[in-house]
Amino acid sequence: MKIVLRLSIIIILFSCNKNEAPQEQVKNDCIGEYTTEEIQDTLVSAFFGLDNALPSLFLCNQQAGLLDGMPVNFKFPLDASSLSETNFEVLDSLGNIHTPICVSMAPANENGENRTVLLLGEFGTAVTNPPVEVRVVGDLFTTDTISGESVCSEIINLSGITTTNIIPLADGPSLFFAQRIDGNLNECNSGTQTIQVAWNGGITPYISGDTESDLFQYYVGYSDSSGVLIPHVPISIADINDNDNFHQLCFSTSDEIVKISMMALTVEDPNHDPNLYSEIDVSSCTP
């Protein structure tokens, strides 16, 4: 029973403003041009979610013992057809380089998601030799955003980008992305605007007795009134109970929501580490 519970939990372990300042432009095998800094910033973080806790045969169809799990988070959506374990390298604190045994974007692979890749393999040990860097070393491509997303993207080859923003095993989850969504992407049954948020690792309710549908009351959205942030509590939450790291927050206000926060000690990751207070700006594409 414990193995089944752990497998259920691990499944969930799972804007494009151009800079006005003159910078070197990079034509990185993509449609359009981005600066080197903009391409680098596409890789937001990696989250050392579980250490030697995941069965390799079940998740990777290989007999390799118990594996580490590390969600890697991107600002732009990824092209699943370009995804491969050989796209990634993980550097540990002793200088060893690890290639994942397998990778997956499931279950966060619905339209409007596709921003988190779960790496499975051996990436070091939490206390004595933690992972310190994640590198994209193969041809991993982003995709254009689709109708209903407030952010924009283009097709970019991410090969060569890295991050040292590795959240340690003992730390709790935090928000890494938010955007406004509408049309077919919107799963809210009520309200006037919907904000999609994404966590850097999988989450479940931390407070005893809470279900995922109760989490809306701990989120706060903010509108901007002449530089003053006005708080708004969502009236409900959608895109839940699907074992991924995305939520949709349903607001009744017509004032544009520009920031989202989450109260501390309300959700936890699969390692049972609770969140601290977290906030994120709502991303949008400026023409």
Place the predicted regions along the sequence by residue.
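Sec-dependent signal peptide recognition
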Residues: K2-I10
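Non-catalytic beta-sheet/beta-sandwich ligand-binding modules that flank or precede catalytic cores
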Residues: E20-P287
